[in-house]
Amino acid sequence: MEKLANTQEPIDKLISKRWSPRAFNPEFIIDKKSILSLFEAARWAPSCYGDQPWKFILFLKDDITPWTRALNCLSIGNQNWAMDASILIVVCANKLFTHNNEPNRWSQYDTGASAENICLQASSLGLAAHQMGGFDEAKIRNLSN
């Protein structure tokens, strides 16, 4: 489904067609090539010193046990629609530079840019991405341990 934004000024179609649906086809399974394309787009996001402070934790619906654990970290409202998503991605930011272990004040900004690249690449592939903040941070942290 293509849904173009009603903009006040002209913007690129890639941006105007990006939106965050709350309905996904429960039968759809994302293919490996598309997943690799999403993360390649993330890799090309700008970052301070080229540090790429992001980390992604990927949960595929066809690997149901870890995917369900990730789904259960979401708020009930987000679980209601995310349960039909083919993939769940946890986006994390490293708060320290890798080259000197000093605080990276721009890590969240840079990580946000990489997440937006994923959203735009999803849109260019005819897929949809929906970022969300409604989750239990402690539960998410336990997923990666």
List each model region and its residues.
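Hydrophobic transmembrane alpha-helix bundles
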Residues: S16-S20, S86-H99, S123-A128
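Short, charged/polar surface micro-motifs in flexible loops or helix N-caps
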Residues: K61-W67, N94-F97, A138
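Short amphipathic alpha-helical segments, especially helix-boundary/capping motifs
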Residues: I11-K17, W44, C92-L96, A113-N117
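Helix-adjacent hinge/juxtasegments
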Residues: S75-T111
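Acidic pyrophosphate-coordinating catalytic loop
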Residues: Q79-N80, N142-N145
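Small-aliphatic-rich amphipathic alpha-helix that forms the alpha element of a beta-alpha
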Residues: A42-R43, I89, N101-L143
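N-terminal amphipathic, basic helical "cap/leader" segment at the start of enzyme domains
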Residues: M1-I87
